[in-house]
Amino acid sequence: IYPGHISISHTPRLAFLAVDPLHPIGIDAELWRDTLPALAPRFMNQREMAVYGASPELLLRAWTTKEAAFKALGIPQLVVSDIILPDDADAAVMTAAGRTLSLHFISPVEGHTVTLARLLPDGSEGK
């Protein structure tokens, strides 16, 4: 077994692999789907809808951020809707389940959004 942390995500067209030798990591890739706006209220609260619901790109970012954070946190009983997004859609750091995660956003191909979340050691603030 690899001595580190691995996360995998894919869309019908692309696949992504994230590896970190020290810290839990999560990656999520999504391709825009017309059903996403109808699903958004199931995983986003009203404040998140106001910040991230303004465009397809932000809605995809919200979904991939929650999914990547969920994977990095590794808490089976955690529900994606309980992961609260930061007020700033471009934030490089967020807190979820009492832990701090660094965030990286990638747009490799038009229509795709990829978010990488890395669980930071306790006491670090994006270092």
Predicted regions and their residues:
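Core catalytic alpha/beta fold that binds nucleotide/phospho-ligands
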Residues: 1-127
